[in-house]
Structure formats: C-alpha cells, structure tokens
Amino acid sequence: MKERNESLDCLKGIAILLVMFGHVQVHNHMTDPYLYDVIKSIQMPMFFLISGYLAGTGKKITNLEQYRKKIGRRAVAYLLPFFSWLVVQHMTYVPQALRTVLFQLDYGLWFLMALFLFTVLCYTAQLLEAVTEKEIAFWAVWLTGCCVILVSYLAGVTFLSPSILIIYLPYYTVAYFVGRHREFVETYAPASMQRWIAGLCAVVFLVMVVMLDLVTVTGIGMLGVQTA
C-alpha cells in the first residue's frame, strides 16, 4: 500500500478550511478589506498546486485501455457531483441552469469542471508520451492545450469559461513539473533554498494583499492595471 504524504494531507485540510471560512464570510455578508483577499488568493491556487503535484508524482497512463478507465473514473468523481449539485440547486429550471453553467462555470461547482478538463488534457498528453516513449510528446500536447485555452480566452470565447481556466492553469503546470521531476528540483534548489524562496514569496504576497485588491485580480493583465 502506498504511503500517504502527510504534508499534502495537511495542505489539503488547510485549503478546505480556508474555502469554508471564505464562504462563511460571503454568505453572511462579512466584509473585511484584507482577510477575504488573503483567503481567496490562497485557497484555489493551493488546490490546483496540490492537484498538479499529485498528477506529476502519480502513476502515468501507458495504454488506451487505461486511459479510458481513468477518464471514466474521473468523470464520475468530478462531473457527477458537478451536475448533481446543479440539479439540486436549480431543480425547477435545470435546462436553463445547464446552459448558463456551461458558459459561466462559476455559476456552479467550477473547480470540479476545471480540474476535470486539466485531468483530461494531462491524461491525453501522457497517452501520447506512452506511444512515442518521449517526454517531449507530453509537453507538446500539454502546451498545445494551454495555447488553445489562451487563444479562446483572448478571443472572448465563454464556453467552459477559459477566463477561469487561464488563471489556474499555470499553478497546475508548474506543480506537475515539480512533482514529475522532484530529483531535478532538489538538485538545483536544495531544501534551504526552497525555504528562503518560500519566505520571500510570502513577504511579497503579504505586501500585495495590503497594497492591491486581489479579489479583482484575475490575471497578470489586471495586476498590471492595478500597479500602473
């Protein structure tokens, strides 16, 4: 039996608590100029970092049959609750709600759909890598998918909300690379250096929380507007 990573379990627990506390604030109309900025800026990026890292460290797709089975399991795990909650929440007008959520994912449990789309792209890239036996094939497929999402966002496409996907795709991508190449990262960035980098990033983040309205920052473009 594979040993669980207790550090990742702790991070997931922290992220879950942040999501709960953030939603308590929103639904009870509790306004705070800094606290919600901090929560919103940490909770979902943390989830996608963890998801990407686990995908990078986990067992890879090796054949088409395995690809089909894993996609099926992920569809049940992610899409079933996504659409079930939509039906429960909008029971009297499901068709209208369905049309809305497919073009505005944050109308529903958007995280599940976003994670499913990233997972499908990841498994597809892994399948091509297994066929060619070259890692470059994985990154070719992955970066092509990233470009499709970026172009869709820039073109104003709203189906499956590229505007949301483009925010969290970098977190998933970087974490996947780190998870897949842990030895490489540890060689060129030892633990002491990682702690210094993490501390510096934390300081920069806290300064951004104080100086900027991170709730409205939906990408590098908006960050540039606020700092101009």
Spans of features found by a protein language model:
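Membrane-cytosol interface segments of multi-pass membrane proteins
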Residues: 1-147
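Short, Lys/Arg-enriched, disordered terminal segments
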Residues: 1-7, 183-195
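Transmembrane helix-loop junctions in multi-pass membrane proteins
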Residues: 26-28, 59-62, 182-185, 211-214
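Membrane-interface helix caps and helix-loop-helix hairpins in membrane proteins
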Residues: 30-35, 97-105, 151-163, 212-219
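Specific transmembrane alpha-helix
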Residues: 44-58, 111-126, 157-188, 224-228
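Hydrophobic, small-residue-rich membrane helices and short re-entrant helix-turn-helix hairpins
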Residues: 64-72, 181-190
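Hydrophobic, membrane-inserted alpha-helices
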Residues: 118, 122, 143-153, 170, ...
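Alpha-helical transmembrane segments and terminal signal-anchor/GPI-anchor hydrophobic tails
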Residues: 187-228
